[in-house]
Amino acid sequence: MEVKQEILTPMKVEKTNGNVPTPPPTTTTTTVMDDDLFDDEASPPQPNKKLKAENGSIKKLTPTPKPAPVTPKPTAAVNGKKPIPKKKPVDSSSDSDSSDSSSDSDSDSSDSDSDSSSSDSSSSDSDVPKKKPISKIPNKPSGTVSKTSKNSPKTTTTTTTTTTTVKSKPAPKVKPEQSSSDDSSSDSSDDSSDDSSSDSSSEEEKPKKKPSKKPAAVKKEITVKKETTTTTKKTPVKKEVEVKKETKTTTTKKVKKEESDDDGEDEKTTTKKKTTTRKRKLKEEEEGEEEEEEGVNKWWDKEDDEDDGTKWTTLIHNGPVFPPAYVPHGIKFMYDGKVVKLTPKQEEVATFYANYLETDHVKKQAFKDNFFKEFKGLLTSEQKEIVKKMDKCDFSHIHTHLKTKKEQRKARSKEEKDAETAEKKKIQEKHGFATIDGFKEKVGNYMIEPPGLFLGRGQHPKTGMLKQRIMPSDVTLNIGEGEVIPPSPIPGEKWKEIVHNNTVTWLAFWRESVNGGFKYVWLAPSSKIKGQADRKKFEVARGLKNCIGDIRKGYQKSFNDESTEKRQLAVALYLIDFLALRVGNEKGEDQADTVGCCSLRVEHIKLESNNTITLDFLGKDSMRYLNTVQIREDAYKVLKTFVKGKKPTDLLFDSLTVTQLNNHLKKQMTGLSAKVFRTYNASITLQKELDKMDTKEFQSIDEKILFYNRCNREVAILCNHQKAPPKNLAETMSKIDEKIQELRDLQDLCRIKIGKTPKSQQEDIESREAERLPKLIQLAITNKKDKDKEKTDKEISFDVKAAFEKSRTLPDAKGKIKEKIAKYEEQIKKQEILKTGKDELKTVALGTSKINYLDPRITVAWCKKNKVPVDKIFTKSLRDKFPWSDVGTDYIF
């Protein structure tokens, strides 16, 4: 098919995102160009100057006769000339050292793509070639294909069209000058595109004839659609030819010519651009993730066991974030029925107490007494004459105000929530990361604790006391020497002190007002420093297995030593080893009465018959430790001598101190401590319990997870990791039972249809089904999701009913119904496993041992061996905490 065509070269050709040249309609075209005919998204360099035809006149559009279809011969070049290589435009955002002009789509893809998401033009004003007179290009030879840029001025043509399908012979592959940024353009030389014209600076010289390219050397079916378009107004240049490339291995490609002045064309183009933009964004995100992965400090792959005390060489951070200043609400505080006007500081403290009115804390006398003492300390002498008793204080109005604010917060719009999330993310990006030795690390607790009332754990004697507001003048920063000191975020305040101590890992610290203890800003658990400490801890515990036998022989031998001190040391070590007790420290009168092994009193132990003892005391966090256990006979006899003649409040190990015990442990093995004993016993217990799994009994993933949790439960019991049963446990169990009953009803409905269950049961099933639908509707209305906020109750009811009926629709085929029955059986089993797990673990906390005492490599090896996804056992935070735990299936603690 011979194609004759007049083409006016536009003054500037923009990028076309890698679209390949395609055969245009068989037309003879004359263009008229002015400033109003450009695409909004493809503005020319000088939009206020009009373009004229070469001779300054306007030519009429002349349709060409309809030619007979012919088969063009493939050509790799035009008139024997090779394609003109593209010159890379000057781009300040591109890599300055890139010398290959054909690689700009690779080196600058992130910059050009981001620009093109909002506009097709990615060049700055300085990159735009000067306008040149438009000259006529000679007609191309038969079989060649011309191409117009997407950003060229529009041309409206009156065309006589034909549709021809041809099969081209294989042509030599042409090396791409630029790879497209589209997803479909990376794997074919067809997409090498004559885009070189869009970046070429040759327009500043003499316009050159554009070489045509044929598709790659594969057999293709090319369908060329030619359409007739007519207009009586301005005649824009025809839009870019779109190439829709098949992603499969087929060699068929469809080339469409877009209509030039169709009313819906702009919408189509916008949609396509949006789709391309989304693809680009996804691609950029993937590349970003890869770059982030490449930037991860895989310190665990480096052999560096030396420890000279230096924790870091360079340290940069922006300091902690302080809570916002208090904003007074002006809600009245009542005393004995009368209003007492409060200052902002007094009102703030009163609001702290009002926040706990509906909790168990206000039921504790110590909480109320301590608060009232703090509150009275803020009152003036005149106010103290009025406010004398806590029982007459009325905080209910403030409490109502707080509840209203809470409801308002829940009712926030999606836009408000998004804005708040964006603000938090902005703060996190600034303060939530530190740069250590060139690596970006997360900061754990970068928020300064806000003021409030101290709660404490268990029966803490200081519960209810006021936690004062922390200011920058209370905070000491630790930062690299010579680094920029972050400014104080509160005007008029200065940091207490700036230090450069590279032998510690904290970033900031201050002293809290209640107990006088220090609070620190640490790096996150996923950081290198924390990870190294964790791995070292587990390696030390793992090494204990090599000498645990000798240590045990040593303390067992000392049970009968003449020295009381040695006998007490031996029995204490035995209890720490056998029962995984904490070492225990002496506590002051103003601290909670929690004890460990060395601080046990006679009242905490009861000697039963048959070498059995019962220990009953408050452990860490005031959690009760109650355990009746049979011990060694020789240890039992020695304990009897320790108890004899002592009062209940006397120490059981009165000749032993924590320092003596720790010093003895260090002599047994480097790094050994009571905590190492707990870590060793916890990890070895998990290892032994997991090794007991019968793969025939536990086959599904859910069954294996239940088995793992049971093993973890044994460790939690050993370490006394308890928790109070959830308050809504009964409700949760009831919901699981209802779900199981529903699944069984659905099974029976399937069986009734195939005649496996008597229809007499159908009435009971339908009765329960009738009760379920209203409940589901009410639940959906009560718990509206953000996407359903605009829907009426009637619309939600309709949607729920439709979904309910759809879920109850049964197929006609008997085989399909049997498949449904089997599927329901799997779901029933899953719910039963869930119920069993919740019941068994209702008073046991599994998380504490996973975080602190269980070598994560044991779990990873077990998961790999039994084909259980690690994320079913470890949360994301735990996976981030233990990146070094990726081991093979043969790992043994």
UniProtKB/Swiss-Prot annotation:
Keyword Iron: no
Record field: catalytic activity: ATP-independent breakage of single-stranded DNA, followed by passage and rejoining
Stretches with biased composition (Low complexity): 91-102, 115-126, 135-171
Xref: SUPFAM superfamilies: DNA breaking-rejoining enzymes, Eukaryotic DNA topoisomerase I, N-terminal DNA-binding fragment
An example Gene Ontology CC term for this record: nucleus
A Pfam family it matches: Topo_C_assoc
Further details from the record: Eukaryotic topoisomerase I and II can relax both negative and positive supercoils, whereas prokaryotic enzymes relax only negative supercoils.
Name of the featured protein: DNA topoisomerase 1
Organism: Dictyostelium discoideum (Social amoeba)
